[in-house]
Amino acid sequence: MDQDNERNVSRLWRAFRTVKEMVRDRGYFITQEEVDLSLEDFKAKYCDSMGRPQRKMMSFQSNPTEETLKKSPNMGSVWVEFCDEPSVGIKTMKNFVIHIGEKNFQTGIFIYQNGITPSALKLLPSVAPATIETFNETALVVNITHHELVPKHIKLSDEEKKELLKRYRLKESQLPRIQRMDPVALYLGLKRGEVVKIIRKSETSGRYASYRICL
């Protein structure tokens, strides 16, 4: 395997691990073994005899954990797909959209290499009420939530959000905001109106929590 390909495979392996962590952090069932897959095992499982990655084989489905379903009983399954083609056009995206709809997935996560055409992006809303999220492979090589300067973010369930507003006698408009395109909001798949709890470390009080609403 040449050095460039070796580097690309290593980056793809790291992106794959981030995706598994991201799906698990959203409350879906992912085993620790899946997260800890070694580079050698990744090559054996997802590369051909020439050492080239076969992205189609990396697609996977995950269901919410029992604990997640207690808090969010309507949370459906997620389908994650890594795209083989460097650039994504209408045909490829249409196939992905059809798959999400036909299999009744609530969320589709589409991971691309270089770019998606504007026409292909226009297809995304057609799966409503399901949602499709797109991520560039490069953006997933490092898990941003593991950075020491990024505090812990936890998405609240609808019930937890109601309790929060009631406890502090707040209206939604009084909560600080987090933009939907914020990297951590994208990582957690936050939708408009959802609230995230942010836990920061404090030198004086140990830990403290703040809340932000996604807009």
UniProtKB/Swiss-Prot annotation:
Q: Which InterPro entries match?
A: Arch_Rpo5/euc_Rpb5 (IPR014381), RNA_pol_Rpb5_N (IPR005571), RNA_pol_Rpb5_N_sf (IPR036710), RNA_pol_subH/Rpb5_C (IPR000783), RNA_pol_subH/Rpb5_CS (IPR020608), RPB5-like_sf (IPR035913)
Q: Name one GO biological process term.
A: transcription elongation by RNA polymerase II
The highest taxon in the source lineage is Eukaryota
Member of which family? Belongs to the archaeal Rpo5/eukaryotic RPB5 RNA polymerase subunit family.
Please provide, alphabetically and separated by semicolons, the GO molecular function terms listed in this UniProt record.
DNA binding; DNA-directed RNA polymerase activity; RNA-directed RNA polymerase activity
> Where's it found, cell-wise?
Nucleus
Could you tell me what this protein does? DNA-dependent RNA polymerase catalyzes the transcription of DNA into RNA using the four ribonucleoside triphosphates as substrates. Common component of RNA polymerases I, II and III which synthesize ribosomal RNA precursors, mRNA precursors and many functional non-coding RNAs, and small RNAs, such as 5S rRNA and tRNAs, respectively. Pol II is the central component of the basal RNA polymerase II transcription machinery. Pols are composed of mobile elements that move relative to each other.
One short Pfam name that applies is RNA_pol_Rpb5_N
Example GO CC term: the record gives: RNA polymerase II, core complex
Keyword annotations of the record? DNA-directed RNA polymerase, Nucleus, Transcription
Subunit text? Component of the RNA polymerase I (Pol I), RNA polymerase II (Pol II) and RNA polymerase III (Pol III) complexes consisting of at least 14, 12 and 17 subunits, respectively.
Q: Which gene encodes it?
A: RPB5
Name used for this protein in its record: DNA-directed RNA polymerases I, II, and III subunit RPABC1
Q: Which lineage?
A: Eukaryota, Fungi, Dikarya, Ascomycota, Saccharomycotina
Main location class: nucleus
